[in-house]
Curated annotation (Swiss-Prot):
Protein name: Alpha-2-macroglobulin
N-terminal signal peptide: 1-31
Covalent link location (Isoglutamyl cysteine thioester (Cys-Gln)): 1166-1169
Domain of life: Bacteria
UniProt-listed Pfam families: A2M, A2M_bMG2, A2M_BRD, bMG1, bMG10, bMG3, bMG5, bMG6
GO cellular component, one term: plasma membrane
Record membrane topology: Lipid-anchor
Lipid-substituted positions (S-diacylglycerol cysteine): 32
Length: 1641
C-alpha cells in the first residue's frame, strides 16, 4: 500500500499530472478524427434572451460575502458612489448588536462598495441599512432595508509557519504548519548532498511558495533540485484544526526514521487532492548545535553551544566547504566550545559543524548580524592615517582650493617620511587630478589647485593613498563646489520645548544679527511651518516605524510669521499649529525662518520638533529589507514595541494587529492622444490578532503574505491611536539574500570608565535580556580576550587592559545564549552586546591660547598670537585660517580638530554570523499524525558662456608656522576690504600631540557701506540698489552717499545726504536700470563723513535673456577690388554684444577662425566636447592667433585649457579604456574613443604632457575592439554600420602608431566594407591600410568612400557625424597623409558653397564635431597653399598694411563697424572673403516648437498654479519646465535663465525638508528625479542647467525652486533646449509672463 501511494504522489508533486492530462486529451482528439464526420449532429439551439432591467437611480445593487485568501467581509454594492462624509457605522448596522465595531465599515476607492471585515465564516448575518444613506449626488436611499448575507466557508490554505532552517534536536515538537480548512497534506522530504550544500544554499535561502518550474528549472547555469538532493521519504499528515479556523500543527518529523541521518533536508508540501502548480517549501536540519562565527581579517572564531541549554558544546567537528563542495579547512572546538581558525571569509563558502547525529550549517552568503543599533560605526583602521583639513568646505568655481594634511600612524604618531598620493575627484567620481606629495617637517602636506571656472558643481573629494594603484583610499576630505554668495547675517532658531503636544503652541525663539556686529534691528523676519508624518520620532531607535504613514496632510509650508524685528533682533513667538496637526500620529513640525537683508536676500535656518499625540506609541520594526519588501508567498515578520517620549519601553495589553491588503482594480482610459491605465483601490482585512507586549521585551509577529501591497495596522486601546505601516511583498522576489532576521537581541553593557590605558582593569556590567551562558570577548581586528560567563542581570566582570589594546578599534562584546524548549514555547536565541573601549589620550591633547583683536578695520593686518606652553622647547607647528563666517555658516563647517580625528572611534571590524535567526520557533499548536509514509519521494556641465561676476570670498591662510622655544607664534594676516566676521582657527601639531582653538574677529569700517542688488541684470530691467549706511565713527555726523553705475547701468538719484547718530543706521534705495550690453558692469558706492570714507565696488553682469545670432556675407573676388563691411549686418544687435570678423583667404571660404574660437569657448564639457575644446587649444598657437586676428586668447589661457582638457579626459576614462560621456554612471559610447585617442596622440606629437597610462589604455581598448570584432552597439537601428565605422576609425588611430594588424584591416575591407553607410568610415579604413603598407586596398577604400559620400549619409546613426563633418574630415585626412587627388580637392569648393548657403540663411549652427573638422580641414589646406594675399585695412581713418599670408583675419567691435571697415586686397585671384557678425538681437526670438516643445510653468509652494502678478520679496515659486521632443534626443541641454530679481534655491545647500512633500500635477518634489532622465543638473547664479535624455513623443518634467529677492521689474527669459550634437535641433519656449515684478512686502 505504501509503495502504491508513493508512486501516485510523485507525479502530483512533480507536476506530471497536467502534462498527462494534456497528452490524453490530444490522443482522444486524434481518435475522433478517424471518421471524418462520424455521427456529428446538425447545429441547433436558439439563444435565450435574458431580460436585464437597467438600474435606475440610487439603489442597493447587491449584498454579498467578499472573500479573498481566507479573509471574509460583508460587502454592500450600490448603484451610485456614496457621500464619503457620512457616519457609516450609524447608518449601516448588523442586526446582531454585539457584532458591530466602530469604524468597521470602509468605503472603496470608487465609493460604490461598503465593506465590513469583522465577521465569521459559515454564519448568517442580517444587515440593517438606513434609508437616510446618501449618494454623492445628494440622493437618499429612501427606504430602510434588511439584507441577509451568508458568509460561507473559508477557502483552504496551508503553509509552513516558520522561515527557520534549524530544528532543535531536543525538546522540539517538529516543523510547524499553519492551515485553514486543510485536513491533510502530502509532504516529500529530500536530503541535500553534502558536496551540494553551497550550491543549494546559494539558490534556496528561505522557505516559501515555489512553482514546479522553480524546483526543476536549470536556467542560468543552475542545477536542478534533483542534482542537489536525493528523495528519502514521502508521507501524508493529518492536520489539526476546526472548520474555518486558522490552526497551527507540528509535523513530527523527529519520529521518522528516514530523517534521522544528519544532514540538510528539503521539504515540499501540498494539500491532499490539490492540483495547483504552487508548492510550499522549507528546508531544515535537525541539530542541537548552536553555531556562532566571528570573521576577522584572517581568522575565524567559532563558538558552539547547545540549543537546548545554551551551554558550550565541546568537541564539535568543523569544516569549510567551497562553492564546489570541496573541503578547504577542518578544525574542532575545544572544551569551551571555541575554535580559532586560520581562515579568510569567502561569501561562497559554507561552514558545517557536526557531532554525532547533530549537524548545523552556516552559509556565509547570508547577511552578517545587524549591529546598526550599537555604536560600532567609524572609519577603517589601516596602518597609517592622514588628517586633512581646509579653512572651509565650500568653494566657488574659479577659486583656489587649499588642503593641508598630516601623515601619521593609526594612533597619531609619526611614521617614516614617504610620498603620499593625492587624487582630486569630481562629483561624478572621476579623477580630476592625481599628484604625488612629499611630506615636509613633522609630516605636513599641502596641496593647492585652482578650481576651473567651468568646473562641475557638486561634492568634490580629496583622497590620500600610500600606493597610487590602490583602489581604496585611506582617508579623504569632501568639499563642495557651488555658485553661492556669502551670508551677511546670522540667524539662530531655538525652542525650549523638546517635544510638542496637541493644542499647545510651538514657541519659537529667533536671534538675528549682522555678521559685522550690529543687531538685525528693523529687519524683516518670516517663518513658514510645514507638518508631515514622522515615522521616526526617536533618534535612538533606527529602523523602527511609528505613526500612520497613510495619513494625508497638507503639502508644502504655510507662512506663519511676517514681522519686523525689534531693536535687539530678538523674537519670541507662539506659532499655532494647523488644524490638520491632530493628535492621531507623531508629526514632524518644521519651522523655516528667514531674516532678510535690507536688499531682500534672506538667510534661512530650520528648526524641527516632533508632535507626540500620546504619552506612549506603538512602533514596528520590519524584519525584512525595507527597500526591497517582504518575500511574496511567505511570512512577513515584524517586531512590535511600545515606548514613551523618553524612548523607554512600556507594556501593552490587547493591541489589535491587522494585516490589510491593498487591491487595485485597473481600467484603461484614453487621454492625451494615447491609451493609458488607471486604477481604483480597495482594501481587505486579511488577519487580525490580539498582541501583548511586555516592558522588557519586544514581540515578534509573523503574517502570511502574497505578492502585492499591504498595511500593518496596530490599534492601541489605551491611546485610541492606530499605527499603520505600508509595505510591499514580492518587490524583489528573486533576491533571496536579504532580510534582517539576523538582527540579534540586545545585551546592555556599561563600562566603569570613560577611557583606559594599558595596565588598567576594565569593569563591565552586563544586563542581558535573559539569563544564560555566554562569552565575553575583547576584539579589534583579531580576538584579544575570550572568557566564558554566566550572564545574569547586573553581572559585573573584570578584564585586564593589555598593551595590545592601545588602539582605537577595541570593543567589548558579550554573547548570551538561551536554550529552547517546546514545553514552554521558548525558542533558542542569542543576544549580543557591544561597547567601544576608548583609550586614554588626554595627555596628547594640548591647550592652545589664541589671541586676536575683537575688531579690526578692513584692509589692515590681523595680528594673531598663538601660545602653547605645553610644547615649549619642543618642535611644533601651527596653521592659522581666517575665513568669512558668512561662508562657514552656510554649511555649518566645524573647526578642524586633529586630536578628535586621530583618537576617534574606528568601526568594529568583525562580521558575525550564526544560525540563531533561523531556528524554527516554538508556538502553541497541535501535532500532526502520520497517515502513511514511504522511503521514496519528490555631467559636469560647466557654466554657459556669460559675463561672470567676481564674488568676494575671504579665506586667509598662514601655512605651517613653527612655534618658538616658548611655544608661541606671532602671525599677521592681511585682511581685504571687507565688512563681516572672520572665524580665526588655529591647529597646532607636534609629532604626537595636537590642539585647536578658534575665535571670532569682527571686521568693520568706521563707515559701514554695504550694497545689495541682483546677481545679474538684463537690458531693460529696472531694479534697486539698496545701501545700508551705518555710523561707527563714534560721533554724530552728516554723510554724503553716492552710487554710480559703470558700464551699461544707470543709477537714478545717485547722490544723497544723511545725518546719523552714533551707531546710527539708515537704508537707502537707489533706482537702477540696465541698458543694452553684454558685459560685467559695476556698481560703485562711496560714502564720506566725519573725516572717514568708504568705497565699495560690486560686479554686476548685464546679459541678454536670449541667445546670440550669427549673420554672414561671403564674396568671391575674381578681380581685385576693395571690399567693405556692410554695417547693416550689425543692425538690430546690441552694440556691446557685437563681435565681427573679416576673413580673406586664397582658399575656399572655410570659416577656420570662427570655428576655432567657437569651439575654444564652447561652454559645456562632456567627453566629446572636452576633446573638441582641447583640439581648439592645441591648434591656437601664437602664429595661428596672429594670422587669424583672434582676440582674447592668451598663451596662458591656451595652456590652461589644453591641460584642463587632458585632465578631464583622464577623469572620464573608464576601467576598460573607453570614455564616459559625463562621468559617473552616464553612458559610454565606444564611438568616441578613437576620436579622443587621436586627440591625445596629436597633443603628444605637439610636445604636450599626455598621460601615457591614459593613452595606452585607450589604444589597448581600440586594439581589443578591432581584433575581437565584439558587437558594441546592440539596440542601434544601424548597429552593423556603426560597428564598422568604429573599427575603421580605431584601425586608423592604431595605424598612426603602427599597431593596426594588416591582416585584420584587410579582412575588414574584403568582408565588411558593404556595411559602411558613410564615406568617412571607408576613408578611415583606406588611410589605415595605406599607413600599414597595403596602398592598393587603401586607395580603393578611399575612392569608394568619396563615391559613397556623394549619396549623402543617414542624418543620425550614432557616430556624431554629419555631411559637413564627414566631408571636411575626409579631405583633411587624405591631404594629411599624402593621398589627395584633384577629384577629392574639388570637394572643398562644394563644401564652401554649402557653408555659404547656410550663412545666407542667417543662422549657421555647427556642432563641435563639425567645427573641429572644419578647423582641421582649414589647417590642412593652409599647409600646402602657395598663393598668398596681402592688402591694406582701413578702420575709419586708421590704416593697417597687412603682409602677405595664406589667410588674413581680423576682429572688430561695434564701434569699429560704425567707423567703417574696408579692405583693399592684393594677390592672385580668385580670393575668398567672408564677413561674420555675432551678436545678441534687441528683439526676443520667436518661440520655436517645430522640433521641441518647451513649456515653463510657475507654481506656488503648495503646488498650485501661480497666477501672474507682483511677487512679494521673499516669496518662493516652483518652476516646472516640460520638454517634449518629436524624436529621440540622447544629448539634450536645457538652459533656463532666471529673471534678474529672482534667485535659485540650491537644493545642494539649502534646507529642502519643507519642500519634500509638495506635489505639482501629481509629481512630488521628493521624486522629481524620476520625472525626467537627467544626466546632470546644476544650480547656477542666474540659471538652471540640465543635461538630459529625451525620448521621442514623451514629456520630461524638470523642477527647481526660485525666490523673489530684489524689488524691481525684470524681463523673463525664454527656456532653451538644444541637441548638443545637432544644434539645428532646438526649441525655444514661449515667455509668459513677459515681465516679473518684485515688490517689498
Amino acid at each position: 500500500m505504501r509503495d502504491r501511494v508513493a508512486m501516485m504522489l510523485r507525479p502530483l508533486v512533480r507536476g506530471w499530472i497536467p502534462r498527462a492530462v494534456l497528452l490524453l486529451t490530444v490522443a482522444f482528439s486524434f481518435g475522433c478524427n478517424r471518421n471524418h464526420n462520424g455521427q456529428l449532429p446538425q447545429s441547433s439551439g436558439e439563444p435565450v434572451a435574458v431580460a436585464k432591467e437597467p438600474v435606475k437611480g440610487f439603489v442597493l445593487v447587491r449584498a454579498y460575502p467578499d472573500q479573498h485568501d481566507g479573509e471574509l467581509a460583508l460587502a454592500l454594492e450600490f448603484s451610485q458612489p456614496l457621500a464619503a462624509t457620512q457616519e457609516f457605522d450609524t447608518l449601516v448596522r448588523l442586526e446582531q448588536g454585539s457584532g458591530n465595531h466602530d469604524g468597521g465599515w470602509s468605503l472603496s476607492d470608487d465609493a460604490k462598495t461598503l465593506r465590513y471585515p469583522y465577521v465569521e465564516a459559515d454564519k448568517h448575518y442580517t444587515v440593517l441599512i438606513s434609508g437616510d444613506l446618501l449618494a454623492a449626488t445628494g440622493s437618499r436611499l429612501g427606504k430602510s432595508r434588511k439584507e441577509p448575507v451568508y458568509t460561507g466557508e473559508l477557502d483552504p490554505v496551508v503553509g509552513f509557519a516558520s522561515r527557520g532552517s534549524i530544528l532543535p534536536a531536543r525538546g522540539s515538537r517538529g516543523v510547524p504548519v499553519v492551515s485553514v480548512n486543510v485536513p491533510e497534506v502530502d509532504v516529500e522530504f529530500m536530503r541535500v548532498r553534502e558536496k551540494a550544500l553551497p550550491a543549494f544554499l546559494a539558490r534556496y535561502h528561505k522557505a516559501g511558495q515555489r512553482s514546479s518550474w522553480e524546483l526543476s528549472n536549470q536556467g542560468n547555469s543552475r542545477k536542478r533540485l534533483s542534482e542537489l538532493a536525493d528523495p528519502v521519504y514521502v508521507t501524508r499528515f493529518v492536520l489539526d484544526g476546526k472548520k474555518n479556523e486558522r490552526a497551527l500543527t507540528y509535523l513530527p518529523i523527529q519520529n521518522i526514521r528516514e530523517l534521522r541521518e544528519p544532514g540538510l533536508y528539503f521539504a515540499v508540501m501540498k494539500p491532499t487532492g490539490s492540483f495547483s502548480d504552487a508548492f510550499e517549501t522549507a528546508f531544515f536540519s535537525v541539530s542541537n548545535i548552536g553555531l556562532h562565527a566571528r570573521a576577522y581579517k584572517d581568522k575565524l572564531f567559532v563558538h558552539t553551544a547547545s540549543l537546548r541549554s545554551g551551554n558550550p558544546y565541546k568537541q564539535v567537528d568543523l569544516l569549510v566547504l567551497d562553492a564546489k563542495g570541496e573541503t578547504v579547512l577542518q578544525g574542532a572546538t575545544d572544551d569551551n566550545g571555541n575554535a580559532l581558525l586560520n581562515y579568510t571569509l569567502n561569501a561562497g563558502h559554507v561552514l558545517v559543524s557536526r557531532n554525532g547525529r547533530d549537524i548545523s550549517i552556516l552559509p556565509f552568503n547570508q547577511p552578517a548580524l545587524d549591529l546598526s543599533e550599537f555604536a560600532v560605526a567609524g572609519r577603517e583602521n589601516p596602518w597609517f592615517d592622514v588628517f586633512a583639513w581646509s579653512g572651509r568646505d565650500l568653494y566657488r568655481p574659479g577659486e583656489m582650493l587649499r588642503i593641508s594634511a598630516l601623515l601619521r600612524d593609526r594612533d597619531g604618531k609619526p611614521v617614516k617620511p614617504q610620498p603620499v598620493f593625492l587624487r582630486l575627484k569630481q562629483p561624478d567620481g572621476k579623477t580630476f587630478r592625481e599628484t604625488r606629495l612629499q611630506p615636509a617637517e613633522q609630516g605636513y602636506l599641502e596641496f593647492t589647485q585652482k578650481i576651473p571656472s567651468d568646473a562641475p558643481t557638486g561634492r568634490w573629494r580629496v583622497e590620500f593613498r600610500t600606493d597610487p594603484a590602490s583602489k581604496e583610499a585611506v582617508q579623504g576630505l569632501a568639499v563642495r563646489v557651488e555658485e553661492f554668495l556669502p551670508e551677511r547675517m546670522k540667524l539662530e532658531l531655538s525652542s525650549a520645548q523638546p517635544v510638542l503636544r496637541a493644542k499647545a503652541p510651538f514657541t519659537l525663539t529667533a536671534d538675528a544679527a549682522y555678521l559685522y556686529g550690529a543687531p538685525a534691528a528693523g529687519n524683516r523676519f518670516t517663518a513658514n511651518l510645514a507638518v508631515a508624518v514622522e515615522q521616526h520620532p526617536l533618534d535612538n531607535m533606527p529602523g523602527w516605524f511609528f505613526g500612520d504613514a497613510t495619513l494625508q496632510l497638507p503639502r508644502g509650508a504655510k507662512e506663519t510669521i511676517d514681522i519686523t524685528l525689534g531693536a535687539d533682533g530678538h523674537l519670541v513667538h507662539d506659532i499655532v499649529l494647523p488644524e490638520e496637526a491632530k493628535p492621531v500620529s507623531p508629526m514632524a513640525v518644521v519651522v523655516s525662518g528667514s531674516v532678510y537683508e535690507s536688499g531682500g536676500r534672506p538667510v534661512t535656518r530650520s528648526l524641527k520638533r516632533v508632535l507626540w499625540p500620546a504619552d506612549a506609541l506603538v512602533g514596528v520594526r520590519p524584519l525584512f529589507d525595507v527597500a526591497s519588501g517582504a518575500d511574496a508567498n511567505g511570512m512577513a515578520r515584524f517586531e512590535l514595541t511600545r515606548v514613551g517620549v523618553d524612548g523607554k519601553p512600556q507594556s501593552a495589553k490587547g493591541l489589535k494587529a491587522t494585516l490589510v491588503r491593498e487591491l487595485r482594480d485597473y481600467h484603461w482610459r484614453y487621454s492625451d492622444g494615447r491609451w493609458d491605465y488607471d486604477f481604483t483601490r480597495r482594501f481587505e482585512n486579511k488577519e487580525t490578532r490580539t498582541v501583548d507586549i511586555s516592558s522588557s521585551h519586544t514581540t515578534t509577529l509573523s503574517l502570511p503574505v502574497e505578492w502585492g501591497d499591504y498595511w500593518l495596522e496596530v490599534f492601541d486601546p489605551v491611546t485610541g491611536l492606530t499605527m499603520r505601516y505600508p509595505f510591499r511583498a514580492g518587490w524583489s522576489w528573486g533576491d533571496d539574500n536579504r532580510g534582517l532576521d539576523a538582527r540579534p537581541d540586545k545585551v546592555k553593557l556599561a563600562l566603569d570608565k570613560t577611557s583606559y590605558r594599558a595596565g588598567d582593569t576594565l569593569k563591565v556590567t552586563i544586563t542581558p535580556p535573559h539569563p544564560g551562558k555566554g562569552l565575553l570577548l575583547v576584539e579589534s581586528d583579531k580576538p584579544l580576550y575570550v572568557q566564558a560567563i554566566d550572564a545574569n542581570p547586573s553581572t559585573t566582570l573584570e578584564i585586564p587592559v593589555t598593551a595590545d589594546w592601545e588602539r582605537h578599534d577595541v570593543y567589548v562584546t558579550a554573547l548570551v545564549f538561551r536554550g529552547g524548549s517546546a514545553s514552554n514555547n521558548t525558542t533558542p536565541a542569542r543576544a549580543v552586546g557591544e561597547a567601544y573601549v576608548p583609550m586614554q589620550r588626554k595627555e596628547r591633547r594640548v591647550a592652545v591660547g589664541l589671541v586676536v583683536p575683537k575688531q579690526v578695520r578692513p584692509a589692515q593686518s590681523l595680528p594673531v598670537t598663538v601660545s602653547v606652553p605645553e610644547l615649549a622647547g619642543k618642535q611644533a607647528h601651527v596653521t592659522i585660517s581666517a575665513v568669512d563666517a558668512g561662508i562657514l555658516n552656510i554649511t555649518g563647517f566645524p573647526v578642524p580638530d586633529a586630536a578628535a580625528h586621530f583618537f576617534a572611534q574606528r568601526r568594529l571590524s568583525v562580521d558575525a554570523y550564526d544560525i540563531y535567526g533561523r531556528v524554527i520557533e516554538s508556538f502553541e499548536g497541535g501535532t500532526g499524525r502520520l497517515k502513511f509514509g514511504g522511503d521514496m519521494a519528490l555631467p559636469p556641465l560647466p557654466q554657459a558662456k556669460r559675463p561672470t561676476a567676481r564674488s568676494q570670498t575671504v579665506d586667509l591662510f598662514s601655512g605651517a608656522v613653527k612655534l618658538d622655544a616658548k611655544g608661541n607664534a606671532h602671525i599677521q594676516l592681511p585682511v581685504p576690504d571687507f565688512n563681516g566676521a572672520l572665524r580665526v582657527s588655529a591647529l597646532v601639531y607636534s609629532d604626537t600631540r595636537y590642539g585647536q582653538r578658534d575665535a571670532e574677529t569682527v571686521v568693520r569700517a568706521p563707515i559701514l557701506a554695504e550694497a545689495s542688488m541682483p546677481r545679474v541684470m538684463a537690458p531693460g530691467d529696472r531694479s534697486t540698489v539698496t545701501v545700508d549706511v551705518q555710523n561707527f565713527t563714534g560721533k554724530q555726523g552728516k554723510f554724503a552717499v553716492k552710487v554710480e553705475g559703470v558700464g551699461p547701468l544707470v543709477v537714478a538719484e545717485a547722490g544723497r545726504s544723511v545725518t546719523l547718530g552714533i551707531d546710527g543706521k539708515t537704508t537707502l534705495n537707489f533706482p537702477l536700470r540696465a541698458l543694452e550690453g553684454n558685459s560685467v558692469a559695476q556698481v560703485r558706492v562711496r560714502v564720506e563723513g566725519n573725516g572717514s570714507k568708504a568705497e565699495r565696488h560690486y560686479d554686476l553682469p548685464v546679459r541678454a535673456v536670449w541667445p546670440q545670432g550669427l549673420r554672414t556675407q561671403a564674396h568671391v573676388l575674381n578681380v581685385l577690388a576693395p571690399i567693405a563691411f556692410d554695417p547693416a549686418l550689425a543692425k538690430g544687435l546690441m552694440p556691446d554684444s557685437v563681435n565681427a570678423r573679416l576673413s580673406v583667404s586664397t582658399l575656399a571660404p572655410i570659416p577656420f577662425a570662427s570655428v576655432l574660437q567657437g569651439v575654444f569657448e564652447y561652454p559645456y564639457g562632456c567627453a566629446e566636447q572636452t576633446a573638441s575644446k582641447g583640439y581648439a587649444a592645441l591648434w591656437l598657437d601664437d602664429a595661428t592667433i596672429r594670422s587669424l586676428g583672434i582676440q582674447g586668447v592668451t598663451p596662458a589661457q591656451r595652456l590652461e585649457r589644453l591641460e584642463g582638457a587632458l585632465g578631464r579626459l583622464a577623469s572620464l576614462q573608464t576601467t576598460n579604456g573607453h570614455f564616459s560621456m559625463w562621468g559617473g554612471n552616464s553612458d559610454v559610447n565606444p564611438v568616441l574613443t578613437p576620436y579622443i585617442a587621436g586627440f591625445l596622440l596629436d597633443a603628444k606629437d605637439a610636445g604636450f604632457a599626455v598621460s601615457d597610462a591614459v593613452l595606452q589604455k585607450a589604444l589597448n581598448r581600440l586594439s581589443e575592439d578591432l581584433l575581437s570584432g565584439a558587437h558594441l552597439f546592440y539596440g542601434n537601428d544601424q548597429s552593423e554600420a556603426l560597428m564598422f565605422a568604429h573599427q575603421a576609425w580605431s584601425g586608423y588611430v592604431l595605424a598612426r602608431v603602427n599597431r593596426a594588424p594588416l591582416g585584420t584591416l584587410r579582412t575588414l575591407y574584403d568582408n565588411e566594407r558593404g556595411k559602411a553607410v558613410s564615406g568617412l568610415s571607408l576613408v578611415h579604413l583606406g588611410v589605415a591600410l595605406s599607413l600599414q603598407g597595403d596602398r592598393k586596398r587603401g586607395e580603393a577604400a578611399i575612392e569608394a568612400g568619396f563615391a559613397k559620400s556623394e549619396g549623402g549619409r543617414p542624418e543620425v546613426f550614432g557616430d556624431y557625424g554629419s555631411v559637413i563633418r564627414d566631408n571636411a574630415l575626409m579631405i583633411a585626412l587624405v591631404r594629411a597623409h599624402g593621398l589627395a587627388k584633384p577629384a577629392y580637392e574639388a570637394r572643398v569648393m562644394a563644401l564652401g558653397r554649402d557653408l555659404q548657403a547656410r550663412r545666407r540663411s542667417g543662422w549657421l549652427w555647427l556642432s563641435t564635431q563639425e567645427q573641429v573638422a572644419l578647423a582641421q580641414l582649414g589647417r590642412a589646406l593652409l599647409v600646402d597653399q602657395k598663393k598668398q594675399v596681402s592688402g591694406t585695412l582701413y578702420v575709419g581713418k586708421q590704416r593697417e598694411d597687412i603682409a602677405a599670408s595664406r589667410l588674413i583675419g581680423r576682429s572688430f567691435d561695434a564701434a569699429a563697424l560704425a567707423r567703417g571697415v574696408r579692405f583693399v586686397p592684393q594677390g592672385d585671384v580668385p580670393l575668398y572673403a567672408s564677413f561674420e557678425v555675432a551678436g545678441i538681437p534687441r528683439q526676443a526670438p520667436v518661440s520655436d516648437d517645430s522640433q521641441l516643445l518647451v513649456v515653463r510653468r510657475w507654481y506656488t509652494v503648495d503646488g498650485k498654479p501661480w497666477t501672474p502678478g507682483p511677487l512679494k520679496e521673499g516669496q518662493a515659486l516652483i518652476v516646472r519646465v516640460s520638454v517634449t521632443s518629436k524624436q529621440n534626443m540622447p544629448d539634450a541641454l536645457l538652459t533656463d535663465l532666471l529673471p534678474a530679481g529672482l534667485e535659485i534655491e540650491n537644493f545642494n545647500l539649502g534646507e529642502t525638508r519643507q519642500w519634500a512633500d509638495v506635489t505639482v500635477d501629481g509629481i512630488a518634489l521628493s521624486e522629481r528625479a524620476d520625472a525626467a532622465d537627467i544626466k546632470h543638473e546644476e544650480f547656477r547664479d542666474d540659471r538652471y542647467v540640465a543635461m538630459l535624455q529625451l525620448t521621442g513623443g514623451r514629456t520630461a518634467n524638470l523642477f527647481y525652486l526660485v525666490r523673489a529677492v530684489t524689488p524691481g521689474s525684470y524681463n523673463v527669459p525664454p527656456s532653451l533646449v538644444e541637441d548638443m550634437y545637432r544644434p539645428a535641433l532646438r526649441g525655444t519656449g514661449r515667455v509668459a509672463p513677459a515681465m516679473v515684478t518684485v515688490v517689498q512686502p
